[in-house]
């Protein structure tokens, strides 16, 4: 009988000390009338190490498609998904290729005409993506987000920046 309060105290400490899990999604909201494919431009670095494991991601015209899901211990954060996308999937540059042969390149830490969006930097041109964090109210004493979704929004104005490419 004396063990019951001790077991309850131990269970309460265990529940409050646990680092809960989170889920992050990366989606493409293609608002154009063209299908789009995202592909890595530099799958290996200068010494031959593979830096991109990305197979091309495709989004049909006028769809909102979840293309990648990750998770782990801790809480959802835009920085987590942005870093995971760059370092684990894209490498340092990607190309958005539309079904009519037009394309737009994005390079990390570049300021050129085609470098309007940097996947590793949450502050780079926020008009191109949106981030949503949902706070799980259970347990009530933990207010961190358990779910996050980063959506790359491809609009007609972005399509108009693209150029014909071979």
Which sequence ranges carry the predicted segments?
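Sec-dependent bacterial lipoprotein signal peptides
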Residues: 1-18
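Intrinsically disordered, low-complexity segments enriched in small/polar residues
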Residues: 18-25, 39-166
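A short, amphipathic beta-strand motif
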Residues: 26-30
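Short acidic/proline- and small/hydrophobic-mixed sequence motifs that coincide with surface turns
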Residues: 33-38
């Amino acid at each position: 009988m004396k063990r019951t309060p001790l077991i309850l105290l131990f269970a309460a400490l265990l529940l409050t000390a646990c680092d809960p899990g989170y889920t992050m999604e990366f989606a493409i909201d293609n608002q154009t009338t063209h299908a789009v494919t995202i592909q890595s431009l530099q799958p290996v670095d200068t010494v031959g190490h593979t830096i991109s494991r990305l197979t091309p991601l495709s989004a049909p015209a006028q769809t909102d498609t979840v293309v990648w899901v990750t998770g782990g211990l801790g809480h959802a954060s835009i920085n987590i998904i942005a870093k995971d996308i760059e370092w684990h999937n894209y490498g340092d540059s990607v190309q958005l290729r539309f079904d009519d042969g037009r394309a737009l390149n994005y390079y990390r830490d570049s300021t050129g005409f085609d470098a309007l969006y940097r996947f590793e930097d949450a502050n780079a041109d926020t008009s191109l993506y949106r981030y949503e964090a949902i706070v799980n109210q259970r347990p009530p004493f933990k207010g961190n987000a358990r779910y996050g979704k980063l959506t790359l929004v491809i609009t007609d104005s972005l399509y108009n920046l693209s150029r014909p490419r071979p």
